[in-house]
Amino acid sequence: MSQVNRRKVLFVTSELADLVKTGGLGDVSAALPRAMRHLHDVRVLIPGYPQVINSGNPIHIISQLGGHAALPPCKVGRMDMKDGLVIYVLICPELYEREGTPYADTNGRDWSDNHIRFARLGLAAAEFAAGEVKSQWCPELVHAHDWPAGLAPAYMRWRGQSTPSIFTVHNLAYQGTVSTASSRELGIPDEAITPEGMEFYGKLSFIKAGMAFANHITTVSATYAREITTPEFGCGLEGFLQSKADKGQLSGIPNGIDESWDAATDEHLICHFAPNEWTRKEINADYVRELFELDASSGPLYAVVSRLVYQKGLDLTIGVAEHIVNNGGQIAIIGRGEPEEEDAMRELAARFPGRIGVRIGFNETDARRMFAGSDFLLMPSRYEPCGLSQMYAQRFGSLPVARNTGGLADTIEDGVTGFLFNESTVESYTEALNRTFQVFAHPELLNAMRCRAMAAPFNWHQAVEPYAELYRDLLKKNVSMTSN
């Protein structure tokens, strides 16, 4: 695309994998702007958490923004990454410079003022789009991600701004709800607190605000876009979302993964390998067994790389664990999450020493080595908007065993690149696992599936063009509306 046609796009997010992440949102927020920069000038706005401020990347203050209602004044800094990606940092120490995650303290308790913290992010995005940030760069389109950025499209609408916006739902279950009593301190107009606006069963919902006031809603897979219009997956918003779908304002665009996920070159792996170099893949498996204190074995190695939360169906994995062990398999589990889920994983490992190992926490290097060393990845998610782990695993020749839902259904070809099961039951899961035992017993079939999985086209190019087309449509409509 010529420089003349490059448009200015501001991503608004609470996570960026380069600096801070708790899940797939951080990966997407880092990868998609980079994948799109040959088409558009895409920059990112993120809160100034300690992980951002202390990242070692220079930050140059470019502007100051005043307060609004209970939202404090703040500064905006510019950070230039080594590869050229421009990050705008919202600097407000009283809101963001705290130990913990972007959302919770070191004990896992949500910050009581999260509504203030992320409303300030949304307002800053609106101020950016209005040209109130003293910068030569002003976005022509704002792309907000998940509930922490939900008020960005809302403030833009309430302030009468014409800049178009997109809101992407990464996980509808996390909605950012707060009492309606907070409306005054957030500067929310009364007319926005309606069923058509951000009111949700007597509360205010940040995610609903993003969906209600953005020009278009996207989700991270085509199947999930359909699922969230149904009671099973709609989290109480299915009717609202169906009305958006009926108006052509809801679409599903799949995520991708970046090019670093290459078994032949990944710097994290113990041993690089290519398709049909399975003895080299086994060297990674040996490392995983040693890391998780598993016995030496020639049986199948199953990996769990996951947040340890109810959504991920880990209770189902506990229910099938003995069946896996009795069939000669081993399980390596890494992740962190809800305390009761973490305790359940520890208890599972204690029941099967040498056969099941667990490491509470998350380490990117070890996770990559697990994808490379395992034969199968377990993903029995109750729902999965997109999922990235199943794509990482396939790229490294580990075949996913997953529930047939959301992005898992869109990215796994059953019996070709992995194994899908339909019901969230131990019985349905067990049937899929029995197929893995059969495939593992026939190396020529196992290796053929591995080759197909490693060749799957999970790059970001599949997402870039649909987003670019959506950007073009919204910008064209905006020009038409503002010229009338």
UniProtKB/Swiss-Prot annotation:
Catalytic activity: [(1->4)-alpha-D-glucosyl](n) + ADP-alpha-D-glucose = [(1->4)-alpha-D-glucosyl](n+1) + ADP + H(+)
Enzyme class, spelled out: transferase
EC number(s) given by UniProt: 2.4.1.21
SUPFAM superfamilies assigned to the protein according to its UniProt record, in alphabetical order: UDP-Glycosyltransferase/glycogen phosphorylase
Gene Ontology terms, MF aspect: alpha-1,4-glucan glucosyltransferase (ADP-glucose donor) activity; alpha-1,4-glucan glucosyltransferase (UDP-glucose donor) activity
Pathway: Glycan biosynthesis; glycogen biosynthesis
Function: Synthesizes alpha-1,4-glucan chains using ADP-glucose.
Binding positions (ADP-alpha-D-glucose): 21
Family: Belongs to the glycosyltransferase 1 family. Bacterial/plant glycogen synthase subfamily.
InterPro entries named among the record's database cross-references: Glyco_trans_1, GS/SS, Starch_synth_cat_dom
Keyword Zinc recorded: no
Keywords of the record: Glycogen biosynthesis, Glycosyltransferase, Transferase
Biological-process GO terms, alphabetical: glycogen biosynthetic process
Native source species: Pseudomonas syringae pv. tomato (strain ATCC BAA-871 / DC3000)
Superkingdom of the organism of origin: Bacteria
Protein's UniProt name: Glycogen synthase
